[in-house]
Amino acid sequence: MSEILFFSPQPLFSHMMNKNSRLHTHSNIKNTFFSEIGIGILGNSFLLLFHILKFIRGHRLRLTDLPIGLLSLIHLLMLLLMAFIATDIFISRRGWDDIICKFLVYLYRVLRGLSLCTTSMLSVLQAIILSPRSSCLAKLKHKYPHHISCAIIFLSVLYMLISSHILLSIIATPNLTRNDFLYVTQSCSILPLSYVMQSMYSTLLALREVFLISLMVLSTLYMVVLLCRHRKQAQHLQGTSLSPKASAEQRATQTILMLMTFFVLMSIFDSIVSCSRTMFLDDPTSYSIHIFVMHIYATVSPFVFMSTEKHIVNILRG
């Protein structure tokens, strides 16, 4: 999704903040945003706890359990961090210094990158699981899960390096009034980057998002083709029912497909809101709508996963 919240060359407020424009005066916007964050924290906490208990009790783990558990942990940390940052956006200036501003924005940036990466990995893994034995992807079915940890560590280091410029560009908002600062929160601002640095950073972000989203789209299309082919084969087998394993795989695949579709739609919506702020309107209301849209995926995704877990569904029904 768009990284415009903290890392765009566009200022988050195109005007100097004053008493009439600060977001903490918009109580409805503030309450809606914190409700979204609260629901997301609750859902991701429950999903993460479910997978931890599943591991401790020695239940048989599926290949997708690790990336799903990791995704819930990433989203939980990201939403908790955003809730803390939002107090400096919607409520009042907390007077953070340079170190706190750099740490919060840098960590948030890395978590957003890992969310995108883990979602892409989950989509690819589900495509590998669903692939038939005759497929070349089937050979990766038992190798891919063992390389997930290495991939996570590698990508974490990579994102930390890509985002390292934030440690230089983020500063505490000075008391002096200057028009060249780009506001992140009431306490934190971004120093303007040179054209070369801005172009290089934007290119790296674009390449990363295009690559990972392309992986998601290709794996999603591949799974759709496999499901359609499997359905046609099942229609020719009169009186033959699907095995429980096949049915479970199909349910898991449909969940991943729904989640990937939702992710892509939210990415498109996020880009539309971002472009509208850049080209037409950039006031506190449009800004708050943007950060609300940015966290819809992290809020909704745990409930999508939990809807397919029989144990959780039975507990909720009981």
UniProtKB/Swiss-Prot annotation:
Coiled-coil intervals, chain numbering: none
Q: Where are the transmembrane segments?
A: 33-53, 66-86, 110-130, 151-171, 207-227, 255-275, 286-306
What topology does the record note for this protein and the membrane? Multi-pass membrane protein
List the stretches on the Cytoplasmic face of the membrane.
54-65, 131-150, 228-254, 307-318
Cross-referenced Pfam families: V1R (PF03402)
Which UniProt keywords are present, listed alphabetically? Cell membrane, Disulfide bond, G-protein coupled receptor, Glycoprotein, Membrane, Pheromone response, Receptor, Transducer, Transmembrane, Transmembrane helix
Which segments does the topology annotation call Extracellular?
Answer: 1-32, 87-109, 172-206, 276-285
Q: In which tissues is it expressed?
A: Expressed in a subset of sensory neurons located in the apical layer of the vomeronasal organ.
Q: GO terms for biological process?
A: response to pheromone; sensory perception of chemical stimulus
Q: What happens when the gene is disrupted?
A: Mice lacking all but one V1ra and V1rb gene (12% of the V1r repertoire) show a lack of chemosensory response to a subset of known pheromonal ligands and changes in maternal aggression as well as male reproductive behavior.
GO molecular-function terms, A-Z: pheromone receptor activity
The similarity annotation says: Belongs to the G-protein coupled receptor 1 family.
Report the protein's function.
Putative pheromone receptor implicated in the regulation of social and reproductive behavior.
Q: What is this protein called?
A: Vomeronasal type-1 receptor 45
Organism annotation: Mus musculus (Mouse)
